[in-house]
Amino acid sequence: MADRRIPGTAEENLQKSSGGVPGQNTGGQEARPNYHCQLCFLRSLGIDYLDASLRKKNKQRLKAIQQGRQPQYLL
């Protein structure tokens, strides 16, 4: 009964849904695209976890890239 509870976090969701033997297709799972990181996975679901300060840094980073400069922030 404990296994039927709703996972509390996205990470827990990922762990529960990624079962199976690595490198073998079990037939029950469709091939999933590989994501760079958990944030990329969440973005693919349409979930944006960036808070306001990170959004500002991301905007500054994109602007720097468009102007041909090396961005100050990696995210």
Curated annotation (Swiss-Prot):
Q: Principal place where this protein is found?
A: host cell
Query: Pfam families attached here?
Result: Tat
Q: Could you tell me which InterPro entries the record lists for this protein?
A: IV_Tat (IPR001831)
Location of motif Nuclear localization signal in this chain is 55-63
Q: Which UniProt keywords apply?
A: Activator, Host nucleus, Host-virus interaction, RNA-binding, Transcription, Transcription regulation
Where in or outside the cell? Host nucleus, Host nucleolus
Region Core: start and end of each range?
Answer: 35-49
Q: Which domain of life is it from?
A: Viruses
GO terms for molecular function, please? RNA binding; RNA-binding transcription regulator activity
Q: GO CC terms for this protein?
A: host cell nucleolus
Q: What GO terms in the biological process aspect are recorded for it?
A: positive regulation of viral transcription
Enumerate the residue ranges of region (Disordered). Answer: 1-30
State the residue spans of region: RNA-binding (TAR): 55-75
Q: What does this protein do?
A: Nuclear transcriptional activator of viral gene expression, that is essential for viral transcription from the LTR promoter and replication. Acts as a sequence-specific molecular adapter, directing components of the cellular transcription machinery to the viral RNA to enhance transcription by the RNA polymerase II (RNA pol II) complex, thereby increasing the level of full-length transcripts. Tat associates with the CCNT1/cyclin-T1 component of the P-TEFb complex (CDK9 and CCNT1), which promotes RNA chain elongation.
The record's comment on protein family reads: Belongs to the lentiviruses Tat family.
Subunit and interaction comment? Binds to equine CCNT1. Participates in the formation of a complex composed at least of Tat, P-TEFb, TAR RNA, RNA Pol II.
Protein's UniProt name: Protein Tat
Q: Which gene encodes it?
A: tat
